[in-house]
């Protein structure tokens, strides 16, 4: 069911922007957090707070395969509960799995970290994008 947009079924598409921290690479579909300088870094398992999801930079003709690097202007959304977005998975997941925040901006079905959402499809690629309903 993967498509060509990260925001699949979002009630309000209020886009936000911030700079990517130097030395960091962020892919569309990664979960991100903001550091003390309000620059984007990859979310880790211990991260808490808003579920910020990196978007593709469609305004510049970029797609899901075009990454942001340090100094780039990152476009992201904070989806609401019930919104459907594509997120990157850390390992294989099944449809209906409860997904949690993991390292490197990805989600997975194990552990006790903050619940991000429910997998709406199965995924087998370690770097794959799947549709997720936000919790």
Predicted features, each with a name:
Residues 1-135:
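Surface-exposed, low-hydrophobicity beta-strand/loop segments enriched in small/polar/acidic residues
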């Amino acid at each position: 069911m993967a498509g060509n947009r990260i925001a699949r079924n979002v009630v309000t598409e209020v886009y936000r922007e911030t700079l990517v921290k130097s030395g960091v690479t962020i892919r569309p579909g990664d979960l991100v957090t903001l550091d003390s300088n309000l620059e984007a870094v990859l979310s880790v398992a211990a991260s808490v707070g808003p579920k910020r999801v990196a978007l593709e930079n469609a305004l510049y003709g970029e797609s899901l395969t075009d990454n942001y690097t340090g100094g780039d202007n990152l476009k992201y959304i904070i989806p609401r509960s019930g919104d459907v977005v594509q997120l990157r998975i850390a390992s294989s997941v099944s449809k209906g799995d409860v997904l949690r925040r993991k390292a490197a901006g990805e989600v997975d079905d194990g552990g006790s970290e903050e619940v991000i959402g429910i997998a709406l499809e199965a995924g087998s690629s370690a770097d794959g994008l799947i549709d997720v309903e936000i919790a």
